[in-house]
Amino acid sequence: MAITDWPVHERPREKLLQRGPNALSDAELLAIFLRTGVAGKTAVDLARELLESFGSLRALLEADLKQFCHAPGLGIAKYTQLQACLEMGRRHLEDTLKRGDVLTDPQTTQRYLVARLRAYPFEVFSCLFLDNRHRVLAFEELFRGTIDGASVHPREVLKRALAHNAAAVILAHNHPSGVAEPSRADECITQRLKEALALVDIRVLDHIIVGDGETLSFAERGLL
């Protein structure tokens, strides 16, 4: 049966308009993105099959081009459309950060860092540069490494902070292992960066570790 033959309150698009996106299942949200199904299958049927094939909505959203296009009903056009949607979401979070004090909205800050860093299969060290009112000036990915770690150079972090005329920074990196607990090396580099930046009166407000579904704040843990 075609979706247009379903009761109005069960159709994904109408359901979203009436009850909001939170009321929809992963399959229903994906069906709206797909718009159409394939021969003999509605968009919802196809969405359910794709979620089962990839294992989760997150796995589908983070699939590379080859994996994505190999799935039935998907292709380059859908891949580019999806990447555009994901990037708009990241930019919306970034714009939200830039309009306020990151210390008064730490959840948005952490959601943004998760969106930027979680999917990497290797370690990425990044930095949020802030003005004297703790508003975001810029976000930069500074160092990339392997699954086990990334080499961080305080001189380069200092150079970029001065280039942005930053008054404070929030450090961040991901743990591809998914575990957000800090290593001894994480604690050491945080202290080195804190000391180096203090020489030019730039404060390290926090160091966020992004894991799989969790984050850790050095400030909240008392490690700064």
Curated annotation (Swiss-Prot):
Chain location of the short sequence motif JAMM motif per the record: 173-186
Top-level taxonomic group: Bacteria
Protease recorded as keyword: yes
Keyword set includes Glycoprotein: no
Gene Ontology molecular-function annotations: metal ion binding; metallopeptidase activity
UniProt keyword terms in alphabetical order: Hydrolase, Metal-binding, Metalloprotease, Protease, Zinc
CDD domains associated with the record: MPN_DUF2466
Domain MPN span(s) in chain numbering: 102-224
One Pfam family hit: UPF0758_N
InterPro entries in the cross-refs: MPN (IPR037518), RadC_JAB (IPR025657), RuvA_2-like (IPR010994), UPF0758 (IPR001405), UPF0758_CS (IPR020891), UPF0758_N (IPR046778)
GO BP terms, alphabetized: proteolysis
Residues reported in the UniProt entry to bind Zn(2+): 173, 175, 186
Recorded family membership: Belongs to the UPF0758 family.
PANTHER family registered for this protein in UniProt: DNA REPAIR PROTEIN RADC, UPF0758 PROTEIN YEES-RELATED
Full protein name: UPF0758 protein Noc_0236
Organism: Nitrosococcus oceani (strain ATCC 19707 / BCRC 17464 / JCM 30415 / NCIMB 11848 / C-107)
